[in-house]
Curated annotation (Swiss-Prot):
Lineage: Bacteria, Bacillati, Bacillota, Bacilli, Lactobacillales
Signal peptide range: none
Hydrolase recorded as keyword: yes
Protein name as annotated: Uracil-DNA glycosylase
Classification via Pfam families: UDG
Gene symbol of the encoding locus: ung
Reaction(s) this enzyme catalyzes, per UniProt: Hydrolyzes single-stranded DNA or mismatched double-stranded DNA and polynucleotides, releasing free uracil
Organism: Lactococcus lactis subsp. cremoris (strain MG1363)
Amino acid sequence: MKKTDWSQPLRNRLAEGYFPKMIEFINQTYQEGKIYPPENQIFRAIELTPLAQTKVIIVGQDPYPQPGKAQGLAFSYPATFKVNRPDSIVNIQKELREEGFSKEDSDLTAWAEQGVLLLNAVLTVPEFASNAHAGKIWEPLTDEIIKIASDDERPKVFILWGGFARKKAKLIDGSKHLILEAAHPSPLSASRGFFGSHPFSKTNDFLVQTGQSPIDWSK
């Protein structure tokens, strides 16, 4: 993990033995099998989006388990893959168009660089084994990231899609921040509350109201 302004707050909050256990888990799992994302991208979300620049947090579940597709950013998918994009990112693009934003590629790096923390609750996954690392090591870390963002004085937007992410609402101070909850953008649930929820325009409205620059969701 590269040193960022997330580093010290995390070390202050997590149990003393957590980081050695985390390093042991990373070393062991990456030696034993095919794990995604690449090891140097595990912490890419907090490396690309410092706490001081974080304005929006989108919570995902875990990385894409297919080769070459996980980028260390929730929901982001390499632009080099032009076909067979995950249905969730396709539905996110549909909602963006509905809200007047044109986002043709599926790589969300530019969002991260604007202050959108794209945080998976579980940061690694074995090949073709979605959610297999849930409950292993990552949730104490990612829960603390959410709490640190909530405790920060600048108002933020927390976007929680689906039942899994919505459970994280209890970690957030709703009196200070905007919490946007909706159905997950997967095909199973997108038509039951994700489409038409307007998370992107609502986010920008809140940012402007709190004296912050809006996100260019088209990037």
